[in-house]
Regions:
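Sec-dependent signal peptide recognition
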Residues: 1-8
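Extracellular/lumenal and peripheral-membrane lipid-interaction modules
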Residues: 11-180
């Protein structure tokens, strides 16, 4: 709701020209719309229930034309013959933002894990094989589910969706251009 208001205010002051979507707006949208919860398991070997609780999107700060996605979550890991272990995971990813003209949506493609930390450290070794599944799951989710969508029920955003010609990634924001 707040991101729509901020974008509407931005559109009201600039009806023709570039419109910026900030990393704060992307972060808010991703946290509201792109919840990630997954269960993994191999019978007799392990079971894990993983939830990503919060993500933060940074745009063009570490690498040009790339987004950084910082995520925090929690998990429950169950191994045969051992009590279940609750823990936390912090994972950082790099992704390539893509603007889809027809949908008026921003997607995050080519997810790459750059670092992660598991607590308690005692389960790091058991959890390490699951990190690949985490990356694949998040990559699949965010390549299919937008990180941000223009609200076509709002007439200014509908106009913007119909007139965006290109986008560029700048430090801290995505700029949507309506020029030729």
């Amino acid at each position: 709701m707040l991101h729509a208001l901020l974008l509407t205010l931005s559109l009201s002051s600039q009806t023709a020209g570039p419109i910026d979507i900030t990393e704060q707006e992307l972060t808010q949208y991703v946290n509201q719309k792109a919840k990630y919860q997954q269960q993994y398991g191999l019978p007799g070997l392990f079971d894990v229930d993983l939830n990503i609780d919060a993500m933060q999107v940074r745009l063009g700060r570490q690498k040009a034309n790339m987004a950084q996605v910082l995520s925090n979550g929690h998990f429950t890991l169950t191994l045969p013959g051992q009590p279940a272990v609750d823990g936390t995971i912090t994972a950082d990813f790099e992704a390539k933002p893509r603007y889809h003209l027809q949908n008026g949506a921003i997607y995050l493609d080519n997810f790459t894990l750059t670092s992660y930390q598991i607590k308690p450290a005692t389960v790091q070794e058991q959890f390490a094989p699951l990190v690949g599944y985490l990356v694949q799951g998040l990559q699949s989710r965010l390549e299919q589910q937008p990180a941000y969508v223009l609200n076509t029920k709002d007439k200014e955003q509908l106009w913007l969706k119909q007139h965006v010609t290109r986008f560029e990634l700048l430090p801290g924001k995505l700029r949507l251009h309506t020029d030729k």
